């Protein structure tokens, strides 16, 4: 380099390290309608000022690095940088804050959940200045959400495909989840569907193991579906898990399911990844099957209150990536989930416009710009005594999935399915008559059991089963 060039470089660039807050903490900034907004729960290391920590979050999740670099002068940092535009202490928590960051839309590739998450949460969570960090919520602007296809079909189209209206859908996960042969698996599916369920389901870890290869399972299951449809006159389905080691193999399995006229297939969206999920969602829209999404591995990411990503963010990103169903917890079953928080992200899955409501953990107003909704699936440790609460909490646009609560019936799978269908229809009728499900739920179930021996037997088996543990992740 010539001496003249060195002189010019020294004149325009000063090497060294400067505080993040000098560039990335901008409390005077007013977010734009086109900005992606993020709310982080931030716990600084002792001695680190919260404004410096907030600025570091904005910097490390956008354009910043640990030192000043001369290439900063080759672009417009003011245009592309993330901005921490405020923070507030978390009530009842010591040295913990909600930090708000605005990201300009140009930082993100259109239609890519993978790129968006890589930018916002890909690196900053390991930053030493932070003791813990959790992404609580995102506001996706209309201009960005319109670059996503979203769910392949959505709730309204699903109801039309199934010709089922005015009640929640009923499902069941086949148990034991592993170890059945394909033929016995198909037999279990048939018994559940003929008893009155709308769907049965592969468990999340049923892929293509030595005891039951995927092709054999698909064939026996479709046999069961067609037989049960012929007997009941209702449209039935089974969530055929197309999750596979490679995207190419996943599409191969999906195509085989479509050749068999399978109405719905399934994907494990977190373990398989967002790129894989978006690929399958687009394929489903083009080829017809509904897409059921399982959230296997979510609790590794979302269960800790102080560090990770809240499930409401994972639910939003799934709606963008694509899925017609998504497991959402139950509130009353065996899995983690408080009522207010669960209802908050259920609305974010289903509704077109959701107002800010901090009491339900919703930090930002979200407008989905007519993107189709995702049907929440309540699953995990539920049985007929939970039915009134489930109908009250989730309403009609949901799928209530009873695994052990169907297959554990003392008379077998079909009577277990009958018990669930009778309980559901009794609760829907009572609600439509104006009765209070929360207060009269047990009485409604007992009244229905007088006319259904299958339901009466189920009431006796599960009368003492409760899952009363304190929720770890509360608002």
Curated annotation (Swiss-Prot):
Subcellular location: Plastid, Cyanelle
This enzyme's EC code(s): 4.1.1.39
GO biological process, one term: reductive pentose-phosphate cycle
Site (Transition state stabilizer): 334
Cofactor(s) named in the record: Mg(2+)
Active-site residues per Swiss-Prot or TrEMBL entry: 175, 294
Domain of life assignment: Eukaryota
Amino acids binding Mg(2+): 201, 203-204
Matching Gene3D superfamilies: Ribulose bisphosphate carboxylase, large subunit, C-terminal domain (3.20.20.110), RuBisCO large subunit, N-terminal domain (3.30.70.150)
Modified residues (N6-carboxylysine): 201
Pfam families per UniProt: RuBisCO_large (PF00016), RuBisCO_large_N (PF02788)
Gene Ontology CC annotation, any one: cyanelle
Keywords: Calvin cycle, Carbon dioxide fixation, Cyanelle, Lyase, Magnesium, Metal-binding, Monooxygenase, Oxidoreductase, Photorespiration, Photosynthesis, Plastid
Substrates-to-products reaction catalysed: 2 (2R)-3-phosphoglycerate + 2 H(+) = D-ribulose 1,5-bisphosphate + CO2 + H2O; D-ribulose 1,5-bisphosphate + O2 = 2-phosphoglycolate + (2R)-3-phosphoglycerate + 2 H(+)
Matches recorded under InterPro entries: RuBisCO, RuBisCo_large_chain_AS, RuBisCO_lsu_C, RuBisCO_lsu_C_sf, RuBisCO_lsu_fd_N, RuBisCO_lsu_N_sf, RuBisCO_lsuI
UniProt binding sites for substrate: 123, 173, 177, 295, 327, 379
UniProt key word Oxidoreductase: yes
GO molecular-function term, one example from the UniProt record: monooxygenase activity
Cofactor detail note: Binds 1 Mg(2+) ion per subunit.
Miscellaneous comment in the UniProt entry for this protein: The basic functional RuBisCO is composed of a large chain homodimer in a 'head-to-tail' conformation. In form I RuBisCO this homodimer is arranged in a barrel-like tetramer with the small subunits forming a tetrameric 'cap' on each end of the 'barrel'.
Function: RuBisCO catalyzes two reactions: the carboxylation of D-ribulose 1,5-bisphosphate, the primary event in carbon dioxide fixation, as well as the oxidative fragmentation of the pentose substrate in the photorespiration process. Both reactions occur simultaneously and in competition at the same active site.
Family: Belongs to the RuBisCO large chain family. Type I subfamily.
NCBIfam families: PRK04208.1
Protein name from the UniProt record: Ribulose bisphosphate carboxylase large chain
Source species: Cyanophora paradoxa
């Amino acid at each position: 380099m010539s001496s003249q060039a060195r002189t010019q470089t020294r004149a325009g660039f000063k090497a060294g390290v400067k505080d993040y807050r000098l560039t990335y903490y901008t409390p005077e900034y007013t977010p734009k309608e086109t900005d992606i907004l993020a709310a982080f729960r931030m716990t600084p290391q002792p001695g680190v000022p919260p404004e410096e920590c907030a600025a570091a979050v904005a910097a490390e999740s956008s354009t910043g690095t640990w030192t000043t670099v001369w290439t900063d002068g080759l672009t417009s940092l003011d245009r592309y940088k993330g901005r921490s535009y405020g923070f507030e202490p978390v009530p009842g928590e010591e040295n913990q804050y909600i930090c708000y960051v605005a990201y300009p839309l140009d930082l993100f590739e259109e239609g890519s959940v993978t790129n968006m998450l890589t930018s916002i949460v890909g690196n900053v969570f390991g930053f030493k200045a932070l003791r813990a960090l959790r992404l609580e919520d995102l506001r996706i602007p209309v201009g960005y959400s319109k670059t996503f296809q979203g769910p392949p079909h959505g709730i309204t189209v699903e109801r039309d495909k199934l010709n089922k209206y005015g009640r929640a859908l009923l499902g069941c996960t086949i148990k034991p989840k592993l170890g059945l042969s394909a033929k016995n698996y198909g037999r279990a599916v048939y018994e559940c569907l003929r008893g009155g369920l709308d769907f049965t389901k592969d468990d999340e870890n049923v892929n293509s193991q030595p005891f039951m290869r995927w092709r054999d399972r698909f064939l026996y299951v479709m046999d069961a579906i067609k037989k049960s449809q012929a007997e009941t006159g209702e449209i039935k389905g089974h969530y055929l898990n197309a999750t596979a080691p490679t995207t190419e193999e996943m599409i191969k399995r999906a195509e085989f399911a479509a050749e068999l006229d399978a109405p719905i297939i399934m994907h494990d969206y977190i373990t398989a990844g967002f790129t894989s999920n978006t690929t399958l969602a687009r394929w489903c829209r083009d080829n017809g099957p509904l897409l059921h999404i399982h959230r296997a591995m979510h609790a590794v990411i979302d269960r800790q209150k102080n560090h990770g990503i809240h499930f409401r963010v994972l639910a939003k990103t799934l709606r963008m990536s694509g899925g017609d169903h998504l497991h959402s917890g139950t509130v009353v079953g065996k899995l983690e989930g408080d009522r207010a928080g669960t209802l908050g992200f259920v609305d974010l899955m289903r509704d077109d416009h959701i107002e800010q409501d901090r009491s339900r953990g919703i930090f930002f107003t979200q407008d989905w710009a007519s993107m189709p909704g995702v049907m929440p699936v309540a699953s995990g440790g539920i049985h007929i005594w939970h039915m009134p609460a489930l109908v009250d909490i989730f309403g009609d646009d949901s799928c209530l999935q009873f695994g052990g609560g169907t297959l554990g019936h003392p008379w077998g799978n079909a009577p277990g399915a009958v018990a669930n269908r009778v309980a559901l229809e009794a609760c829907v009728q009572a609600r439509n008559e104006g009765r209070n499900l929360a207060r009269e739920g047990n009485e409604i179930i007992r009244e229905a059991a007088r006319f259904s021996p299958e339901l009466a037997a189920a009431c006796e088996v599960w009368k003492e089963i409760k899952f009363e543990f304190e929720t770890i992740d509360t608002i």
